[in-house]
UniProtKB/Swiss-Prot annotation:
Gene3D superfamilies: 2.40.50.100. Residues 22-104 form the Lipoyl-binding domain. The gene is gcvH. The glycine cleavage system is composed of four proteins: P, T, L and H. Signal peptide: none annotated. Its cofactor is (R)-lipoate. NCBIfam families: gcvH, PRK01202.1. HAMAP family: GcvH. It holds the Pfam family GCV_H. It comes from the Bacteria. It comes from Bacillus cereus (strain ATCC 14579 / DSM 31 / CCUG 7414 / JCM 2152 / NBRC 15305 / NCIMB 9373 / NCTC 2599 / NRRL B-3711). Keywords: Lipoyl. Binds 1 lipoyl cofactor covalently. GO terms for biological process: glycine decarboxylation via glycine cleavage system. This is Glycine cleavage system H protein.
Length: 127
């Protein structure tokens, strides 16, 4: 699967899509492939504050439990409730159906510090 050029990426394999002063966050195709079949997703409540580089939730797969690290800081304004009933969406549609949280940015400049698609591809040895 190709890496979408319109997103930014963290070294912990989260993607970020900018929508005005908000961002949508999910995990990458590479990450879901490494984790295997996702069976449970734990996300923060709407209204929670998340801090860049700090855990904001977790995903449980048949192999392991892995923490989700916030690529940016801000206030959670929406969570993807579908993932409670359909955690497999993370495997099936990591960039579309399996977005995790929408966050109102506290510092928009944090997005620019994230990896471009090209840099993320280099980091993960993907073409």
């Amino acid at each position: 699967m190709s890496i979408p050029n319109n997103l930014r990426y963290s070294e912990e394999h989260e993607w970020v899509k900018t929508e005005g002063n908000e961002v949508v966050i999910g995990i990458t195709h590479f990450a879901q492939g490494e984790l295997g079949d996702i069976v449970f997703v734990e996300l923060p409540e709407v209204g929670a504050t998340i801090e860049a580089n700090e855990p904001f939730g977790s995903v449980e797969s048949v192999k392991t439990v892995s923490e989700l690290y916030a690529p940016v800081s801000g206030k959670v304004v929406a969570v993807n409730e579908e993932l409670s009933d359909q955690p497999e969406l993370v495997n099936e549609s990591p960039y579309e159906g399996a977005w995790m949280v929408k966050v109102e940015l506290s510092d928009a400049s944090q997005v620019e510090k994230l990896l471009t698609a090209e840099k993320y591809a280099e980091m993960t040895n993907q073409d």
